[in-house]
């Protein structure tokens, strides 16, 4: 029971540190589109795709998968999880469900971001 928890925790620490570092270094370059965020989202998508394929053909302990996918990619970006879910739907020929999931994630995220901002300003009295 402890090895899975430690695997996730260690991966999470490393993913979060990398996200923070890339944000610090890359976001100031072109603030209109935070390059650190774009970089971690694209890298996370690549890493999770590669890792899912690799672990599907590997005899490694499941703890390595927890370290890379759940821990590292989960802390680096949640976009990587979203990406693999959409690609899995597309590979299964579920184009309609993939488009629906994309719409829900994208529109839902924007709506909840706006709701979060509005809630803050409402609570703060601004």
Swiss-Prot record:
Q: Which residues bind Na(+)?
A: 74, 77
Q: How does it sit in the membrane?
A: Multi-pass membrane protein
UniProt-annotated location(s): Cell inner membrane
Could you say how this protein's activity is regulated? Answer: Na(+) is not transported, but it plays an essential structural role and its presence is essential for fluoride channel function.
Looking up InterPro entries in the UniProt record yields: FluC
Q: Name one Pfam family in it.
A: CRCB
| Gene Ontology annotations of biological process type | cellular detoxification of fluoride
Arranged from A to Z, the UniProt key words for this protein are: Cell inner membrane, Cell membrane, Ion channel, Ion transport, Membrane, Metal-binding, Sodium, Transmembrane, Transmembrane helix, Transport
Q: What does this protein do?
A: Fluoride-specific ion channel. Important for reducing fluoride concentration in the cell, thus reducing its toxicity.
* Family statement: Belongs to the fluoride channel Fluc/FEX (TC 1.A.43) family.
Q: What is this protein called?
A: Fluoride-specific ion channel FluC
Tell me what organism the protein belongs to. Answer: Acinetobacter baumannii (strain ACICU)
């Amino acid at each position: 029971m402890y090895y899975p928890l430690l695997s996730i925790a260690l991966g999470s620490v490393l993913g979060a540190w990398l996200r923070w570092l890339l944000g610090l270094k890359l976001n100031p370059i072109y603030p209109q589109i935070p390059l650190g965020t774009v970089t971690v989202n694209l890298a996370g998508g690549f890493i999770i795709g590669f890792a899912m394929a690799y672990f599907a053909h590997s005899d490694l302990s499941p703890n390595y998968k927890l370290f890379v996918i759940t821990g590292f990619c989960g802390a680096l970006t949640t976009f990587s999880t979203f990406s693999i879910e959409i690609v899995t739907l597309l590979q299964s020929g579920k184009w309609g469900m993939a488009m629906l999931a994309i719409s829900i994630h994208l529109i839902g995220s924007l709506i909840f971001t706006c709701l979060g901002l509005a809630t803050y300003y409402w609570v703060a009295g601004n």
